[in-house]
């Protein structure tokens, strides 16, 4: 995923060092917890290797950004059987698609129904948190807020919980507005879980497996329950000071050639509460 402003080599590379790997094995007990997400399903054959490192994974309900298909569908049982928790994701609309406040509200409601239908079909339990991927950052315009809140309300009515994946970085070209804070301040009493992106070094550690999953307080969004601190490919305009990405700009899972990932820290080993057992 990639936040745009208005928001995957060899088995072992400089991205992850061998010494960092054992220290970051999937945690038990208290958090925070390391997880990953990626637009393409990593394959059943890689799940056990990834689970030795990560507690949870992203799981798309519709086509991820820039993709014409979604190959995560149908793999929920395999992912849970491997021991993963979930970050359940639905790719939202860009501003150019919204046109007007009334149209944005209609799209938010219809997209929420699509997310709910797929979540149910995939077997996610009621009260699972579905994160809406808000790709564009900065201050949200009226049409964007109309879409977001219509989506959130419809998801909640259906018995699921709503989350939003959005920027946690101050937009210097937009009055230093932080998208997550802007959405929260206008949300009223809506119950929204926030997944904040801040891949700038610092505060992000970059593409590395730290001794412990980084504290979410470091993300700059105090109320975030998930922090994405590295993206593939590296965003040079934001994460240019991070020196530990692979030479091709991606962040690779150790020991799994070709599997590039985004890195996350969360307060729960199952941030969407998507497991059934």
Positions of the model-derived regions?
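Bacterial N-terminal signal peptides
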Residues: 7-19
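Sec-dependent signal peptide cleavage junction
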Residues: 20-28
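Substrate-binding cleft of extracellular glycoside hydrolase catalytic domains
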Residues: 28-158
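Aromatic-lined carbohydrate-recognition surfaces of secreted/lumenal glycan-active proteins
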Residues: 158-176, 226
């Amino acid at each position: 995923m990639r936040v745009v402003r208005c928001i995957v080599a060899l088995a072992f590379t400089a991205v992850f060092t061998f010494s960092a790997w054992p220290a970051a094995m999937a945690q038990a007990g208290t958090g925070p917890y390391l997880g990953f997400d990626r637009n393409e399903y990593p394959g059943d054959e890689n799940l056990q290797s990834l689970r030795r490192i990560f507690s949870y994974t992203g799981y798309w309900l519709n086509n991820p950004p820039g993709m014409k298909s979604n190959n995560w569908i149908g793999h929920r049982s395999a992912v849970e059987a491997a021991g993963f928790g979930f970050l359940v994701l639905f790719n939202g609309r860009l501003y150019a698609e919204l046109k007007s406040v009334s149209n944005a509200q209609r799209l938010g409601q219809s997209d929420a129904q699509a997310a709910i239908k797929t979540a149910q079909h995939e077997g996610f339990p009621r009260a699972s948190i579905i994160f809406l991927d808000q790709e564009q950052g900065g201050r949200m315009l009226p049409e964007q807020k109309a879409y977001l809140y219509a989506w959130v309300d419809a998801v909640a009515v259906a018995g699921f919980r709503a989350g939003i994946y959005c920027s946690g970085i101050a937009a210097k070209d937009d009055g230093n507005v932080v998208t997550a804070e802007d959405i929260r301040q206008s949300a009223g009493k809506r119950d929204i879980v926030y997944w904040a992106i801040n891949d700038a070094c610092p505060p992000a550690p970059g593409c590395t497996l730290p001794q412990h999953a980084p504290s979410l307080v470091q993300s700059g969004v105090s109320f975030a329950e998930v922090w994405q601190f590295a993206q593939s490919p590296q965003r040079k305009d934001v994460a240019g000071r991070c020196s530990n990405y692979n030479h091709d700009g991606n962040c690779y899972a150790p020991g799994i050639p070709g599997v590039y990932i985004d890195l996350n820290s969360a307060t729960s080993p199952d941030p969407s509460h998507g497991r059934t057992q």
